[in-house]
């Protein structure tokens, strides 16, 4: 284990621990702590990428939990065009127990944003961006459940927006798949990527249990959202279930990232269990829920209730790459009301960017069992598996 320490007031994380590889082909696992100011951040991958990923997650969480700067207080119709204000009103009406009049007349704290398509500057409610309970405390009654879906951090604004778009597509694809139980295609669990650490993870997981890989991309969308599932009945294995998801412009890239994410979740849960921790030690409700899903039945429930829209199992990973323009055109056909929150700061003489993509016409967060706008432009109550509308997706 390698530990790196920084000063208390440093912009950089307090402690970083890099665990040794299980073998020369396995990915590195890096974790970051910061004097309990944020929840730990982690990443897996090739050595440098795991370090970069963990640091990026640290900066992202630090910003969205602690550093959201709000503007003045305005009503929805004062801060944005009427069509967007109406969409947010309907979303908050579903989420809260308040009337439309109460939502329309309420003055929300604001943050700056721009429309994803027109690039027009506007403001949006800070409560859908800030993850703490202080920044927009008076607005929490309209939007109590929040998460990091759609968030991104990068040294380039374009790359940060691209990261947010991928996060956004992952969330929408995952929730629609969970609620409807439909996947586009299945990818062979015996797939070979030609990338050492990816193939090594798949080999290790296959030797211990079962793997299923599904393309769950939103219907008609360019690119690929790949969900990788792992489950085992092995009684001596601490980890019975794990999963990873990634959206990318090529199938191979999405698959590889989803496998790494599955492995990251696997290692995090394994470290937690061997450390002797319990549910009482977990603050994050998503992580607490994911820990409760650590059973083989979570794997079988997903696999047995997945309807494939195509019976063909993919045996190879073609390299068809879609452009961001195609994705933007696809999203705009569904809704014009997609917005990008953005902020920047200087870290060690470099400019870095934070972004988050949100839309009242899509799922606003990932907890479908909580206070959410479940009726939107891509899903309506009763369109899928009814029992799942009140049961959170088994995902970290």
Swiss-Prot record:
Residues 41-396 form the YcaO domain. It is found in: Cytoplasm. Keywords: Antibiotic biosynthesis, Cytoplasm, Plasmid. Disulfide bonds: none annotated. It comes from the Bacteria. Pfam families: YcaO (PF02624). GO terms for cellular component: cytoplasm. GO terms for biological process: antibiotic biosynthetic process. The keyword Cytoplasm applies. The keyword Isomerase does not apply. Necessary to process the inactive microcin B17 (McbA) precursor into the active peptide. This is Microcin B17-processing protein McbD. It comes from Escherichia coli.
